[in-house]
C-alpha cells in the first residue's frame, strides 16, 4: 500500500495474517512442484516474504500413489510415484480383503511430534515390503512416458518445427494447462488508486503466458499467435527451466492433459518432434 501524507509518500507492505495450513494427501509429483516453487520464490536473487512465511508454517502429509492416474507420467520425470522428500509425514495405503492399513514415514521433527500423539506401532518388514511392491507396481503400470534424454537440446533445435503449427491448429489458448500446472508461477501486477489519488494499492494475481496481453510490450504482443504461445509454454517448461532453475519445470502430474478441452498431450507433442528428427 502507498499513501500520500503531508506531501510525502509512505509505502507499507501488507501483513499476511493467514493461519498455518495443513495439506493432506499431497502426491509425490506435487511435492516436487513445491520444491520447484521454492527455487523460484526462495532461492533466487529475491525472496518472496509472503511465500516464505506460508511455506515455513505449512504442514504436509503426503501419500504415495498406489495406482497410476490416467494421464500422469511422474515415473518418467523421476518425481513419483514414491514421495522421497519434502513432507512431514508420508502415507502408503495398503488394502487387503481383511485389513485396511497405512504405513507412515516420518520426514521432519514436526511430523514425528504429530505421530507421537497418534496410536501407531512399528511396521513389520513384510508390511514395508508390501508397500514398496505396491509403489513399484504403480510405476510399472503408468500409461504415459516422456523420453527426457536430451530434451532441452531437442526443443531448442526445433524452434521452427512444423509440429508447432499442427498443435496451434488445435490449441484454443484457453490457458487451462498453465492454470492447473503446479509449477507455473507467472503473475501480473495491478495498481489501484482511490479517487483523490492519496492512496494506492498494488495487487498481484495469477496470469498465464497463453493470453495475448501477457507478452504485450509497447506497440503490441511479441507472441501474437497460438503457435508462439504454446511453443513458449512447452519449451520453457521442459527446456529453459533447466537453464533458469537447474531442474525441469514439469513434474509429470498430467493435469495439463486432463484439463485440455481439445486433448493436447505434451508427451505426444514431444514424441512427434523427436520421431521426426530420427527419421
PLM features: residue spans?
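Extended amphipathic alpha-helical segments enriched in small hydrophobics
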Residues: 168-178
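Active-site-flanking alpha-helical
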Residues: 34, 182-186, 261
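A donor-sugar binding/catalytic signature common to diverse glycosyltransferases
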Residues: 176-192
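Iron-sulfur-associated redox domains of electron-transfer enzymes in respiratory
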Residues: 1-156, 164, 195
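Short, flexible micro-motifs
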Residues: 28, 178, 257
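Ferredoxin-type iron-sulfur electron-transfer modules in oxidoreductases and energy-metabolism complexes
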Residues: 148-169, 187-279
